[in-house]
Amino acid sequence: MQDTSKQYDAVVDTCKSLFIKKMGDYGSAWRILRLPSLTDQIFIKAQRIRSLQQNDVRKVDEGEVSEFIGIINYCIMALIQLEKGVVEQPDMSTLEATKLYEEKVSVTKRLMEDKNHDYGEAWRDMRVSSLTDLILQKLLRVKQIEDNKGKTIVSEGIDANYQDMINYAIFAMIHLNEDKS
């Protein structure tokens, strides 16, 4: 589990670094996005990953890793939007956004550690394609919850689904990094 924690942190560092750089380029323009818009952005990334996994020919020179980073960062933005609400104008400094980013990652990592303990790191025996499918399944669930105006009868809420997608994407990146080495 110690290895998992270090690997998890390394993936998060990569994602957070890109998030901060994009905050420098664009500011917090993402703060105007409603949750369904963020969900759709994540869906596009996950669909592209699935297409890359199924097709041999690529017309755009970006691989799975950059798409998984996008999924992680968009999910964290969605968690921030759930907490802070949508705004009409960008309103957040890089410092404040980074602090919120780190808070969301911390809670999500704790969830991963708890589930990892209970499931015995079962994700290590899963294929990246299966993790991609789980992300797509979670996205379909989130879309349904959004269509139901956020109401669920017995299921966990949108935030838990975003957290699971973050963890699945991080697991996929750990697998892809291990395959490289």
Name what the model sees in each region.
Residues M1-S181:
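Intrinsically disordered, low-complexity regulatory regions
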